[in-house]
Amino acid sequence: GLFGDLGTSTDDRAQLFWTSGHQYEMTDYREWTNGYPSVKFRNSNYFSASTPTVFSGTDFPLFRLADAYLMYAECVVRGGSGGTLNQAVDYVNALRTRSNATTITPGQLTLDFIIDERARELNLEGHRRSDLIRFGKFTGGSYLWPWKGGAKDGTAIPDHYNLFPIPLKALQANPKLTPQFG
């Protein structure tokens, strides 16, 4: 996984996953005791009584400095001008040091590293689908994850899944919109 063994990882971000009584790999996506349930936005003792599921309506951040640092690193690795590889590594290492993860060298800062670091740092914050599309890993079969395409071990999905559908009401309200069928 992204953190190695969750039971022994020194990366503080790995502690966001509750593993007591759970098996690491999901065998049935409908069972709460399968997979990696996260407590990232669980806040059962803050201001109000817990709900029966012990999850609260805690707001989550939309903009984070960590996201900006990782965007900077991605732009540099993709060849963008105005940034330096050393500064990108410093930004990434600031995040990793804060999380008690090992630092990296400039040679380790690759696009594959960045997409994995985005998954570790920004998990459950609503970025993953867009990240996978931007990195060319959301559709097709070259990058699989459990339950991709509805198959336990993952399977390829068609490229039209890279597109968000235009809601029917929007199409009906504006005849100039053209849907991209898939």
What does each of the following model-derived ranges do?
Residues 1-65:
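Flexible, polar/acidic helix-loop-strand segments at domain edges
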Residues 24-25, 83-84, 130-131, 139:
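Flexible loop/turn segments at secondary-structure boundaries
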Residues 60, 96, 104-182:
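Long, intrinsically disordered, low-complexity segments
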